[in-house]
């Protein structure tokens, strides 16, 4: 089976990352999804988390199915790029990717980069897509045409992926990327994959036995592509990344395909009977093949199998020329350059890369569209609030005027002698139906608790940010320039601004609460009177004498005006509801604008849409205000006439004052209750917003803590690696110096070492057994830690034995006094003539001779070495048996 030595880029590796919590939190904070959509989004987040684990953390087979998983994950990342922002400030998720080419070392781990950025994740996944494409292409068997076509296609797609990544990587990775993601590295990989794609096309042509003219162009272009790849791979910035085999194979294939191009051109020359040029090109081909042997391994049989054909063709052509043609061999330098044909090109990358891709987050709109929709909602809310406030202020103004005129209570006084006017009965009943003064007091009592709850959330949020900043400042102060991550001030600016914004909102709300409280105190007496039962309310109002006038035309006219005013207030309530409930789906307009221009002119689109759907409502509001203006003038004119008619009335000034106060209190109650309910709703609505802000800050602090721990771990590893490397270097230097010192002493020791003693003479056979040694001495010797008994005779015979104890068979190794030696001992061979061991080293604790041995001199003492040197302060000695 022919092999072609195709190269494939390695995959980047990463760690497991939990996407569920941060993505769910971000979606809840940003998007107001319905209950049905919320369940769909939660399911999509879970599916995305599983997809990442499968695509990035599990082993990938060199198969199209594994590539489909990677491309699907990448397409999903692109789809949510504008929907779910992942950044260090908005939605921090730490992605850690290791360098694909760095294998690490004994003292350091693989180079890696950790960033809280979704674009960094996309860049790493895109690199792995290009790498896996190259691996699948290189793994083809090249037995069939389909396999060759698949290989050429995948190599071109891989080249396109690396080329695209080269152009955009610096914009996707905000910090300096790892070496595998540097533009020069990606350019070299793209050039290499393009060369291999052209080579696959050459293999297809060679298999199909294409014409020599075509093979010349294809092979010459293969050599050209490999030459470009070799130049890019030889740059200083990327030269250290590649394995030695890579550089050798690329250089070898550059030469080999130059040789093949010359060989195929020689075939063309042979067909044209250009023997001189044919011989020159064949000789150059052989020369190039000989040079390629220095780089290209012999196991790449797909190329080396052609080499015998070149050699054979050269021999045949030379023979024919020598015997038949006798043409002069052309000078190769004068020959024209070979034509080239570019058949392989990097395939432009298209998204989505997965056929029939389906976005799991289709219910979410891009953040730009979402922001535009929020701006539209803000404009719409501003319009609704403005029109509502205009109507409410006008209503309050009208009610104030009527209360100052004591209308409609004054009309009841002229037609009835009842102390409590009918209009006040209705107002009191309505006020008590709404809860009366107790309801107002209850709402007031809840506001401080609601305010304090939101204030506590903001305080805790600020505390989390401050603690994170203090921790970062402490580490930066301790480690200085080694602490390379971004400072907290650079990242927390938007969060601090948001906290300040909500503090300002709370302060404004607190001031509004005080104003409402003051207004309540000014109308408290009237509200409390209206909250009493009818008899108590009647007793608090001064009575009146018989009325002076009856149902006059002026009274009837005023009653008609009051009825018209009631109709106006009823219409305004309906108008307020219509303003609040008017909605439209403007998302399609924004999506269309974004698809056409990649930009959204939100102001123009929003204003045009608002004018379209709110134009008629605004006209009705203005008509209501105009009607009120006319009606107010008519009421004031009629009231002047009415006041003149009732001049002789017996109604006292105190009664009129009380009736006016109660009328104003009734109107104030409605406003106060609405204000307090609105304030309660405001605080309750603000709480989840602040909780989401607190969660966002907590996620940011957690991500920063994870980043901090990872950076500290890397710093510790670098410190430990540096210490370990220093220790190894010091150890090697120590060994080298000790070896040199020992070698010098060993060279001097033979002159000072004692001569080797003669071998022992065998003892004469004896009928009687030798006298055993004393039992006392044996018992002492049997105790490992016991010192030998004092023997002056032995000390005289062996004064040097006390220098140090040595292990038998091992030299230059002093042993500690009185300790057993667990080393190997010579095997005991018993004899009938020696019931006790009588050879040196039999008792390892102490090297002594028995008295009979000393007398007979049958055994020599243990060899002593370096004694003179030791006594003279010299170094270690050499082995005396050398």
Swiss-Prot record:
GO cellular component terms, A-Z: basolateral plasma membrane; cytoplasmic vesicle; endosome; multivesicular body; organelle; recycling endosome
InterPro entries: ALIX_V_dom, BRO1_dom, BRO1_sf
Sections of the chain in a coiled coil: none
Classification via Gene3D superfamilies: alix/aip1 in complex with the ypdl late domain, alix/aip1 like domains
Gly residues bias locations: 872-882
Biased composition range(s): Low complexity: 791-830, 847-871
Signal peptide residue numbers: none
Domain BRO1: 5-398
PROSITE patterns listed in its UniProt record: BRO1
GO terms for biological process, alphabetical: endocytic recycling; endosome organization; mitotic cytokinesis; protein localization to organelle; regulation of protein catabolic process
Region (Disordered): 743-882
Lineage: superkingdom: Eukaryota
Gene Ontology molecular function terms on file: Notch binding
Start-end of Pro residues biased regions: 752-763
Functional description taken from the UniProt entry: Required for lin-12 degradation after it has been internalised in the vulval precursor cells.
PANTHER family: PCD6 INTERACTING PROTEIN-RELATED, PROGRAMMED CELL DEATH 6-INTERACTING PROTEIN
Name by which UniProt lists this protein: Apoptosis-linked gene 2-interacting protein X 1
Source organism phylogeny: Eukaryota, Metazoa, Ecdysozoa, Nematoda, Chromadorea
């Amino acid at each position: 089976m022919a092999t072609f030595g195709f190269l494939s880029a390695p995959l980047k590796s990463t760690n497991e990352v939990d996407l569920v919590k941060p993505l769910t939190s971000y979606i809840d904070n940003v998007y107001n999804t319905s209950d049905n959509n919320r369940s769909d989004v939660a399911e999509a987040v879970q599916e995305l988390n599983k997809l990442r684990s499968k695509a990035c953390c599990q082993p990938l087979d060199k198969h199209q199915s594994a590539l489909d998983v990677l491309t699907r994950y990448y397409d999903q990342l692109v789809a949510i790029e504008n929907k779910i922002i992942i950044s260090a400030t908005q939605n921090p998720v730490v992605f850690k990717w290791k360098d694909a080419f760095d294998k690490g070392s004994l003292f350091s781990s693989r180079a890696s980069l950790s960033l809280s950025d979704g674009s960094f994740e996309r860049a790493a996944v895109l690199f792995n897509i290009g790498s896996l494409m190259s691996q699948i292409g290189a793994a083809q068997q090249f037995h069939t045409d389909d396999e060759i076509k698949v290989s050429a296609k995948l190599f071109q797609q891989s080249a396109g992926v690396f080329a695209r990544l080269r152009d955009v990587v610096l914009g996707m990775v905000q910090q300096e990327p790892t070496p595998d993601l540097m533009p020069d590295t990606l350019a070299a990989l793209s050039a290499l994959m393009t060369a291999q794609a052209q080579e696959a096309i050459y293999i297809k042509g060679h298999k199909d036995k294409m014409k020599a003219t075509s093979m010349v162009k294809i092979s010459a272009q293969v050599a050209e592509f490999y030459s470009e790849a070799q130049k890019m791979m030889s740059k200083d910035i990327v030269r250290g990344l590649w394995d030695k085999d890579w550089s050798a194979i690329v250089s070898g294939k550059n030469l080999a395909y130059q040789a093949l191009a010359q060989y195929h051109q020689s075939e063309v020359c042979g067909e044209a009977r250009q023997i001189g040029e044919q011989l020159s090109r064949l000789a150059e081909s052989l020369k190039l093949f000989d040079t390629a042997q220095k780089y290209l391994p012999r196991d790449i049989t797909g190329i080396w199998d052609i080499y015998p054909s070149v050699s054979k063709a050269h021999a045949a052509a030379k023979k024919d020329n020598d015997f038949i043609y006798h043409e002069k061999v052309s000078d190769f330098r004068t020959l024209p350059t070979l034509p080239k044909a570019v058949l392989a090109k990097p395939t432009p990358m298209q998204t989505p890369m997965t056929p029939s891709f389906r976005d799991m987050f289709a219910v979410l709109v891009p953040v730009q569209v979402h922001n535009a929709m929020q701006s539209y909602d803000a404009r719409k809310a501003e319009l609704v609030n403005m029109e509502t406030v205009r109507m409410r202020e006008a209503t309050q103004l009208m009610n104030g005027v009527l209360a100052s005129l004591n209308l409609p209570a004054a009309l009841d006084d002229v037609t009835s002698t009842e102390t409590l006017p009918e209009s006040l009965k209705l107002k009191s009943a309505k006020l008590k139906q709404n809860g009366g003064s107790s309801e107002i007091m209850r709402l007031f009592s809840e506001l401080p608790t609601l305010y304090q709850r939101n204030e506590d959330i903001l305080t805790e949020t600020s505390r989390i940010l401050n603690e994170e900043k203090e921790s970062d400042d402490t580490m930066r102060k301790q480690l200085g320039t080694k602490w390379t991550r971004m400072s907290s001030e650079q990242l927390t600016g938007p969060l601090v601004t948001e906290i300040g914004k909500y503090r300002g909102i709370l302060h404004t709300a607190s001031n509004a609460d005080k104003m409402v409280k003051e207004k309540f105190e000014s109308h408290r007496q009237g509200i409390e009177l209206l909250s009493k039962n009818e008899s108590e309310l009647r007793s608090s109002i001064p009575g009146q004498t018989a009325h002076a006038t009856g149902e006059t035309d002026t009274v009837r006219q005023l009653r008609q005006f009051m009825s018209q005013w009631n109709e106006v207030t009823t219409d305004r309530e309906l108008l307020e509801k219509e303003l609040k409930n008017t909605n439209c789906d403007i998302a399609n307009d924004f999506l269309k604008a974004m698809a056409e221009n990649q930009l959204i002119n939100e102001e123009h689109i929003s204003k045009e849409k608002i004018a379209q759907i709110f134009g008629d409502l605004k006209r009705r509001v203005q008509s209501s205000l105009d009607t009120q203006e006319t009606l107010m003038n008519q009421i004031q004119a009629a009231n002047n006439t009415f006041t003149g008619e009732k001049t002789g009335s017996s109604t006292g000034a105190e009664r009129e004052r009380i009736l006016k106060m109660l009328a104003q209190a009734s109107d104030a109650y409605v406003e106060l209750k609405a204000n307090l309910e609105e304030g309660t709703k405001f605080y309750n609505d603000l709480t989840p917003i602040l909780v989401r802000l607190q969660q966002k800050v907590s996620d940011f602090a957690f991500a920063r803590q994870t980043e901090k721990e990872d950076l500290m771990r890397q710093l510790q590893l670098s410190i430990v690696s540096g210490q370990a490397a220093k220790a190894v270097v010091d150890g090697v230097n120590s060994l080298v110096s000790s070896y040199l010192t020992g070698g010098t002493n060993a060279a001097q020791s033979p002159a000072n070492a004692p001569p080797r003693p003669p071998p022992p003479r065998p003892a004469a056979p004896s009928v009687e057994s030798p006298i055993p040694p004393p039992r006392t001495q044996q018992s002492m010797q049997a105790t490992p830690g016991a010192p030998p008994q004092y023997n002056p005779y032995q000390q005289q015979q062996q004064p040097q034995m006390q220098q140090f104890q040595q292990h038998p068979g091992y030299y230059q190794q002093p042993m500690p006094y009185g300790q057993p030696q667990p080393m190997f001992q010579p095997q005991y061979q018993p004899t009938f003539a020696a019931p006790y061991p009588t050879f040196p080293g039999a008792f390892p604790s102490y090297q002594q001779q028995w008295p009979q041995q000393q007398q007979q001199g049958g055994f020599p003492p243990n060899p002593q070495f370096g004694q003179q040197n030791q006594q003279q302060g010299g170094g270690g000695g050499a082995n005396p048996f050398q």
